[in-house]
Structures are given as C-alpha cells and as structure tokens.
C-alpha cells in the first residue's frame, strides 16, 4: 500500500515538473522588446574569430607593429566580451569635451548631442528643429551602452545570485529584466507628464483642441526624444538580425516601422499629445509582460497572477485606449480645434493628415490584435488545460536550447 502510494506521489511530482517545464509564459515572443548584444547567441564564426584573437595575443612580439596589433586585438577581445565598452568610450569623450569646454550654450557644437535645443527665451518651452536628430542619434548610443552595461554588470550577476544556471535562460532573463528596468522608468515618467497636462486618463479632446503644439515643456521634450532614441536603437538591432528571427519577425519589423513613422510624423507635424498617450500604452503593458516572463523563468508561484495582470493591462491599454484614440480621430479630429492646412502657421490638422493618422494607428492596432490572439490562446490553455505552450515561440524550446548548450560543453 505504501509502495503504491509512493509511486503515485512520484508520478504526480514528475507530471508537475513536466508541466512546469512546458510552461511558456517566458517564451511569449510578442511585444516590442528586441534582444541586446549581451543576450545574443554565440555563432560559430564569432567563436573562430575569438580563437584567432587569442592566438594572436599569445604569440611573440618581434616588432613594434606586433605590439600595436596585440593592443588592438586585446581591445577587440574585451569589447567582444563586454559590448558596452565602445559606446562607453564614445559617451565619455563627448561628455568630457562638452563639460570641460565651459560653454554649455547652444553655440557649443556638442550641445545639440548632449542637451535638447531650441529653448524659447525666458521660458521652459522648447521648439523643434533639425538639431533634435543629433540628440536622438547620440542617445541611441547612450541606450546601447545602458542596455549592455546593465545586462553585463548588474543583471547577469543577479541571475547567478538567483541560481539561474542555464545560459539560455539567463540570456532570456537579461532581455526581460532590462525591459522591466526601462519600462519601469519610462512608464511612470510618461504618466507623470500626462498627469501634469490636460491629457490625464487618456482624454482625447485636448489632443485636437490645443493643436498645434509647436513647443513642448522641458520634461515633455526629453521624454519624447528619449523614446525616439530608444525605439530607433531597437530598430537598428532588429534590422541587423543579430539573433535568430522570431516566428513573428515580420510582424515585429512591421510594428517597429509603424512606430517609428508615428514618432516622426507626430513630432514633425505637432501631434505629440497623441504620441504621448501611445507611448504610455506600450510601456506599461510591456512592463507587465516582461515581469511575467521573468517570474516564469524563476519558476515563481506568482507567474499566473502577474500574467493575468499583464493580460488586463494589455487589453485595456493597447486595445481599449488605442481604439478610443482611433474613434476620436473619426469623431473629434475635424470638430475640435482648427481644421485647416496652413504651412505658414504650421497647421497640419486637415483632410490630408486625418487618414494618415488613422491608418498608422490602425496598423499598430492590427499587430496588437494579432498578438492579443496569441495571448488569449495561452491564457485559455493555462486556465482550461493547465498548460502554457506557445505554438508561435522560437522553433527551439528552452529545453532543446539547454540540451544543445550541454552538448557544446561536453564537446
């Protein structure tokens, strides 16, 4: 009797472990997060290059040129292992030159990279101009450094502390914990700006009634251009295809193209109030997505609860709020505020911009609806079937990736 009971308990334990291993909340490859360099898989070509560098470093230096080559190979090897070094040196050089110059006005050529430009005299408002592109470009480098530094120096040791031994799972946690950090800052920052504006709780009429918003407060412009830099940096990594593409790679590329078009058009044509609301909907929902995936990697009992919160915020922010904005384009765009095309006064809220705004937001909504279908399918299986298998995750599961990792170590 005891033996039979023990066998039954063992079977339950095995089944529970199997079910947990099949859990794929952590493998939901949707949302806007793009992997960083620190989380990229090591290819055969990169391994061969590393071997060549190590061979060159261990060789004898017969000439001065050999010593220079060793210095160069040493730097390349360090940069290969710590990909944040190059952007760090660029940032240090630019910041040092700017602050040591003693000139922190817009007459300094470096000002357009380090600080926002076009301050309206005697006010906290800032206009827009071509120099804003320099700011976005420089902070693309900043976000590259921040992402890789946090992953390599802060998050990776933390995953070791949490006893995450699988390299594959560790890399996935690097991506998601960075997303938690970024969205955990940008989401509340955006909500703070919204709270101190006339848009609180996603009001739509002020988006059109006060148009055009030609100047923005300091924090608003910092937030908007910072988000532009973040998304542009993400897009660059995505286009380079430094990681094996996800199954929804085309949808992800399409999502980034639409997002960048929305950022550019909303900024240039003064629809930044609408852009602020859309930024917030993406950041807050992505925070809960990354949090649920991270908890899943840690086999936390809170995973289902947080995943439920994620589903709620995703539906409310990415669908209810976004569809309300779409509806406002059809019902309020013409009637609230000026509705005229006038290049002299920068009035672009007219019959030309209405369909463009609607199509771009609708395109974003279509991608989100596709991802919602996948989310609800996982939620259904979680509730009714007790599994969380995601059929649209990478072709290799966590388990197969970890098996390959073990084979490589054995070889």
UniProtKB/Swiss-Prot annotation:
Activity regulation information from UniProt? As part of the ceramide synthase complex, inhibited by the sphinganine analog mycotoxin, fumonisin B1 (FB1). Activated by ACB1, as part of the ceramide synthase complex.
Q: What class of enzyme is it?
A: transferase
Q: Where in the cell is it found?
A: Endoplasmic reticulum membrane
Please give the residue positions where the record annotates the modification Phosphoserine.
Answer: 23-24
| GO MF terms held by the record | sphingosine N-acyltransferase activity
Its lineage reads: Eukaryota, Fungi, Dikarya, Ascomycota, Saccharomycotina
PTMs per UniProt: Phosphorylated; phosphorylation is induced upon disruption of sphingolipid synthesis.
Its recorded name reads Ceramide synthase LAG1
The record, for Pfam families, names: TRAM_LAG1_CLN8 (PF03798)
Q: Which residues lie on this side of the membrane: Cytoplasmic?
A: 1-81, 156-172, 241-249, 296-305, 383-411
Q: Which residues form the TLC domain?
A: 168-385
Lumenal compartment spans: 103-130, 195-217, 269-273, 335-353
């Amino acid at each position: 009797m005891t033996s039979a009971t023990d066998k039954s308990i063992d079977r339950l334990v095995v089944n529970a472990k199997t079910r947990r291993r099949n859990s794929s909340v952590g493998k939901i490859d949707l949302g806007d997060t793009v992997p960083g360099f620190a989380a990229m898989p090591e290819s055969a070509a990169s391994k061969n290059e590393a071997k060549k560098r190590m061979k060159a470093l261990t060789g004898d230096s017969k000439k001065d040129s050999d010593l220079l080559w060793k210095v160069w190979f040493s730097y390349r090897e360090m940069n290969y292992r710590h990909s944040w070094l190059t952007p760090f040196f660029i940032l240090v050089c630019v910041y040092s030159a700017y602050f040591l110059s003693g000139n922190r006005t817009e007459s300094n050529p470096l000002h357009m990279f380090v600080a926002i430009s076009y301050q309206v005299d005697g006010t906290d408002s800032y206009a827009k101009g071509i120099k804003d592109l320099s700011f976005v470009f420089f902070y693309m480098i900043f976000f590259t450094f921040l992402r890789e530094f946090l992953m390599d120096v802060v998050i990776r040791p933390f995953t070791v502390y949490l006893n995450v031994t699988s390299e594959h799972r560790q890399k996935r946690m690097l991506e998601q914990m960075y997303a938690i950090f970024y969205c955990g800052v940008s989401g509340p920052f955006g909500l703070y700006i919204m709270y101190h504006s006339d848009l609180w709780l996603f009001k739509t009429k002020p988006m059109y009634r006060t148009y055009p918003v030609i100047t923005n407060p300091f924090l608003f412009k910092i937030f908007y251009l910072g988000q532009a830099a973040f998304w542009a940096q993400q897009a660059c990594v995505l286009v380079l295809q430094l990681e094996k593409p996800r199954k929804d790679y085309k949808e992800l590329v399409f999502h980034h193209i639409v997002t960048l078009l929305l950022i550019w058009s909303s900024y240039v044509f003064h629809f930044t109030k609408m852009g602020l609301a859309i930024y917030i909907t993406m950041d807050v929902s992505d925070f809960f997505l990354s949090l649920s995936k991270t908890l899943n990697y840690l086999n936390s009992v809170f995973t289902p609860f947080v995943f439920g919160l994620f589903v709620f915020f995703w539906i409310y922010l990415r669908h209810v709020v976004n569809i309300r904005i779409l509806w406002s384009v059809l019902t309020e765009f013409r009637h609230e505020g000026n509705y005229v095309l006038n290049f002299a006064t920068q009035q672009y809220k007219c019959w030309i911009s209405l369909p463009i705004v609607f199509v771009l937001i609708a395109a974003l909504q279509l991608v989100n609806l596709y991802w919602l279908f996948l989310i609800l399918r996982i939620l259904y299986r979680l509730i009714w079937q007790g599994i969380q298998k995601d059929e649209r995750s990478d072709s290799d599961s966590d388990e197969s990736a970890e098996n390959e990792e073990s084979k490589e170590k054995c070889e």
